[in-house]
């Protein structure tokens, strides 16, 4: 799902050398909780008599992408409480990586020094690519990212898995859905050319759109430093006769796009993917502008099947969970099921756990918040995306 400027770098280095560097900064000062203010984020189930199993979480809790990282952190924390049992008492700690690859590796090593036995993270794609390179080195630590969607995250690694759809999967499914339901529309493809999530979906969408005979009359792009106004791009799309926008972008720029279209009187349909989940919670956004918006996502807070999770999340964190939180929760669920499948003790060594959890992942089925999840030996998830339309401020299945 996520790239969000997760800056990458060459992470192939001795893990313990990075741990030593982190220790030099003072581990206690680095450990941060599930709030932008930081603090200890250790969590456990008060009802569990099981042995302690340590799960790490990494994501941006400060900076421009903080809302995504905080959701992931909260989802992991809540999952650790809910899935603890008489065998495993799940304890979590989280680290802030500011959506930066180098900082994410430092965070990973800090958690490894803490004794992390499995990682549910990082949040962003660039950070996940960097951390996956280190997690796959000996001594390995099992990693499942809730929200990074690039195939580069898992490629060539036996112990790295994903909870969310891959970018190609989203692009292909979106094109097929639009061909079946909006085949007469004229499309403008609108995406962030500097973002691997957005451009990855766009590339797959274009290929499938050609096969599905969708008419793309315009293609408009932007970059991270130009997200305050999209009037120029919309003007071009309108002049070329586009009647529908396909925009695999995040909810913050999507809110700007909808407002710009409204301000210029451009009546155009719009569809996004899972990164657009959360648009109704954008601060200062007139949510009436999102009426009729389509998005493809495996999670809806309005689905009655998710009511218990939504209530527990609201009670704990004072806000409605988004897909980032749900994916993180499902990530913890997957670790719990894989541990059970592998028959591992709570005090299992992280390196031993890594290979056995990876083997178990291809055998389990998780009935999660984001669907029924299974995994292949490439670490990619199989689950069905669902198209929703926003009506009266709620998600309704399209």
What are these model-derived regions, one by one?
Residues 40-43, 68-72, 82-154, 163, ...:
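Beta-alpha junction/loop-to-helix N-cap segments that form part of ligand/metal-binding clefts
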Residues 49, 56-75, 83, 95-102, ...:
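Extracytoplasmic "Venus flytrap"
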Residues 319-325, 336-394:
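Segments of small-molecule ligand-sensing domains
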Residues 258-329:
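Extracellular/periplasmic periplasmic-binding protein-like sensory domains
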Residues 1-13, 21-32:
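N-terminal secretory signal peptides
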Residues 61, 160-221, 244, 335:
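An alpha-beta-alpha
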Residues 104, 163-186, 199-201, 227-231, ...:
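Hydrophobic alpha-helical segments within soluble ligand-binding/sensing domains
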């Amino acid at each position: 799902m996520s790239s969000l400027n997760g800056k990458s770098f060459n992470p192939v280095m001795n893990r313990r050398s990075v741990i030593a560097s982190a220790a030099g900064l003072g581990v206690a000062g680095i450990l941060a909780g599930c709030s932008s203010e930081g603090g200890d984020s250790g969590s456990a189930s008060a009802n569990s008599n099981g042995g302690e199993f340590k799960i790490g979480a990494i994501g941006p809790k400060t900076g421009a992408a903080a809302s995504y990282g905080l959701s992931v952190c909260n989802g992991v924390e809540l999952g650790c409480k809910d899935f603890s049992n008489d065998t495993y008492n799940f304890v979590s700690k989280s680290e802030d990586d500011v959506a930066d690859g180098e900082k994410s590796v430092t965070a990973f090593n800090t958690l490894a020094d803490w004794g992390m036995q499995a990682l549910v993270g990082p949040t962003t794609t660039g950070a996940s690519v960097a951390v996956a390179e280190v997690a796959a080195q000996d001594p390995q630590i099992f990693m499942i990212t809730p929200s990074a969607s690039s195939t580069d995250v898992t490629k060539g690694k036996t112990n790295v898995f994903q909870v969310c759809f891959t970018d190609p999967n989203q692009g292909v499914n979106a094109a097929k859905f639009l061909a079946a339901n909006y085949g007469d529309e004229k499309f403008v493809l609108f995406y962030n050319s500097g973002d691997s999530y957005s451009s990855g979906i766009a590339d797959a969408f274009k290929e499938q759109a050609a096969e599905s005979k969708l008419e793309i009359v315009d293609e408009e792009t932007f970059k991270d430093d130009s997200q305050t106004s999209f009037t120029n791009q919309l003007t071009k799309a309108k002049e070329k006769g586009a009647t529908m926008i396909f925009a695999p972008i995040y909810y913050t720029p999507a809110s700007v796009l909808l407002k710009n279209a409204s301000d210029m009187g451009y009546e155009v349909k719009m569809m996004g993917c899972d990164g657009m989940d959360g648009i109704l919670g954008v601060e200062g956004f007139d949510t009436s502008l999102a009426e009729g918006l389509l998005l493809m996502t495996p999670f809806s807070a309005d689905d009655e099947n998710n009511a218990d999770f939504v209530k527990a999340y609201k009670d704990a964190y004072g806000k409605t969970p988004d897909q980032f939180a749900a994916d993180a929760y499902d990530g913890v669920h997957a670790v719990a099921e894989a541990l059970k499948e592998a028959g591992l003790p709570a005090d299992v060594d992280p390196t031993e756990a890594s290979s056995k959890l990876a083997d178990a992942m291809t055998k389990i089925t998780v009935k999660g918040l984001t669907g029924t999840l299974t995994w292949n030996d490439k670490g990619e998830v199989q689950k069905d995306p669902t198209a929703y339309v926003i009506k009266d401020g709620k998600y309704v299945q399209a």
